Amino acid sequence: MKKGIKIIAAAVAIITVLITIDRIPAIYYRLLSESEQEKTSSDSSHGGILALVNSSHKYVDTGEEKVRLYDKKSDSFFLSTSEIYLDKRAVEPLCKMLDDFKNTTGLRTINVISGARSVQSQKDIYNEKQLKYGYLYTKKFVQAPGFSEHHTGLAVDLALFNSEDGTSEDFDGKGKYSWIIENAWKYGFILRYPEDKKSITGIGYEPWHLRYVGIPHAYYISKNGLCLEEYIDLLQSKSQSEPLKIAVGKRTYKVWHCESKPKKASFSGDNCGGYIAWK
């Protein structure tokens, strides 16, 4: 009898694993498939999901379409204002991730507080922080106007909101909230400013700041402990004949750098004078 119980228990465990695996396509493989068809909306090497914007690489407006997050969201999370906009390619993945976070943890506390910003908005924030905290603090956590990746609409800042008493607090990525940090890559997002990369990114640790780069790239960056700067640098030495190979999901991607817009491949400008291609 005990043997029979063990067999049944083992069968249930196997079924549970299969169900868990079977859930992946709905939240993962379709987004992965869509990332295979990624293109910039212009021929510019300055635009696209892998465009690097930091203190050394100024933002260039290439006309990427931005949409209002309020019009696409569910009730799984909050917005600090209805006028938060994001690059259209980041909207559905973000909503899916936050829906899944709520369904997994039961927490309806995530508050999206920032998305796309104009240069003027960044200037206002930069000046306000300087007046309040001083230059050194501001330089550590806020990019100068024109050099913030918030201009791209591919970056998002999270906070926490308690709907019962109306209080808010910083998102620290700890406890149940670590789910977002650990699973962000499945939706194409990365932790943009890791704690151990301050000397490279030039920005202090920001667990609340996520950047959309697409699933294959997010997977490689996250699993190899890189920041976006390191990933772009790595790809500079990769060519179509000798690409970086990324095995993720059911696919193996070939990723490489090229000087001109590639043909028959998904691509993004790197904002460093070239393009990143993958297929």
Predicted regions located by residue number:
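Extracytoplasmic cell-surface/polysaccharide-interacting catalytic and binding patches
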Residues: 4-10, 15-115, 119-279
